[in-house]
């Protein structure tokens, strides 16, 4: 399956994996700065953005990770950084675990932002989408802009930072054919039943890892980030103040310096 992606800049590659219901748009506030030193690959996960949305129901973390691994192989990516947010962070974790078994691990650093990683209570709107009848009807019952505004208000700590451009961009992606059905399937498979079994393998990740977490995340609790930091041996945990679940959109001025500092230090440690 050919997933849609956008590329910017030149240099060591960074592969970006967005969260649930999002697209490559979520990275728009960090692209300009990071593309000055790196080649950025902004992927739309299966069922999201401009990528295919087949009715095959294969929208789990594992299924998404297999597609990401195929892209890494196809493009022969080396000295690679993966950045994953929320659901995309869960995909990044599974991908990092798989790459550990490669003869030559191409992953040089991992950045996880407010990441799905363990069993946890899901937000009400995700639980609703998982229900057999309501999940099918709900996306069609309310105007898309209303749904997007509600979700962004939950995701942002300061909802004054939610702009009309954001709402328009998220809404446009959800209007694409097949998007609503793909969203429902992804919601139903967001946290796999064996997530704690998978989590037991996190200590096997030896790649230098930066874990960023919004101080007021109401979707994936900050305790998840702290637990993840303990589990991954070569990790650094940073709380991003004055932000919710999407700090790279809400306070990019706080996120960017941390990413740049981490990339510089992890590259320096390789020489």
Model-inferred region functions:
Residues 97, 105-140:
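Flexible "cap/lid" loop of the alpha/beta hydrolase fold
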Residues 3, 141-203:
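Conserved alpha/beta-hydrolase catalytic His-Asp/Glu region
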Residues 205, 211-213:
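Short beta-strand/loop motif that positions the catalytic acidic residue
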Residues 216-220:
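Acidic catalytic loop of the alpha/beta-hydrolase fold
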Residues 1-14, 35-38, 73-78, 260-271:
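Alpha/beta-hydrolase fold catalytic core
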Residues 235-271:
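Catalytic active-site module of serine/aspartate enzymes centered on a nucleophile-bearing elbow/loop
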Residues 6-50:
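Conserved HGGG/HGGXW glycine-rich cap/lid loop of the alpha/beta-hydrolase fold
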